[in-house]
Amino acid sequence: MKKLKVAILYYSSTGVNYQLAQWATEAAQSAETEVRRLKFRETAPQQAIEGNDAWKAFHNSEENKRETEASLDDLEWADVLIFSVPTRYGSVPSQVQSFIDTTGGLWFEGKLANKVVTAMTSAQNVHGGQETTLLSIYKTMMHWGAIPVAPGYTFQESFEVGGNPYGTSTQTDGTGKVLDDVKPGVEKQV
């Protein structure tokens, strides 16, 4: 039987969504899938990065530097797409949207249809737009013809990690720390 190909696509300014993507990678590998963990290209001005100590520290870290950037070939390759992105004003960050805006050719050729998609997110406060961020990802995926798969309330860990039916979401303190114990939720969602 052919192994499922899983692309874990993340953007992380301070390391929180990198951590979620690592947990998702471990969970996908334990399910004996072929996995690629890929980051979205950083497009923020250097001045913005330098103005935030946590962002600067993660951006310049060895772990961030050795991660591979996502490409359109990765989207075409994958059977399953797992997104982990921070919330920006109730939507995805510009780095993620810029990448999504380049997928028109794949979409037009039908190469994004029937891919299974799920997503997770983080924000600095409890009601920081996590649910709308996940819905904005799923809305785009529906335009692609992909198949969004949210965890819903199908496992106990969902309630223990904030109860977001659209995907695992967590709160961060802005320094790169995950404030909630969401690892079990990430593992179940994957």
State where each predicted segment sits:
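N-terminal beta1-alpha1-beta2 submodule of the flavodoxin-like/Rossmannoid cofactor-binding fold
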Residues: 1-111, 174-189
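Accessory recognition modules or surfaces
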Residues: 13-15, 20, 47-51, 120, ...
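Gly/Ser/Thr-rich beta-alpha loop segments that engage phosphate groups in nucleotides
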Residues: 86, 92, 130-131, 169
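Alpha-helix boundary/capping detector
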Residues: 101-108, 125, 143, 167-168
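Short, glycine-/small-residue-rich phosphate/pyrophosphate-handling segment
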Residues: 113-161
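Glycine-rich phosphate/pyrophosphate-binding loop and the adjoining helix
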Residues: 147-190
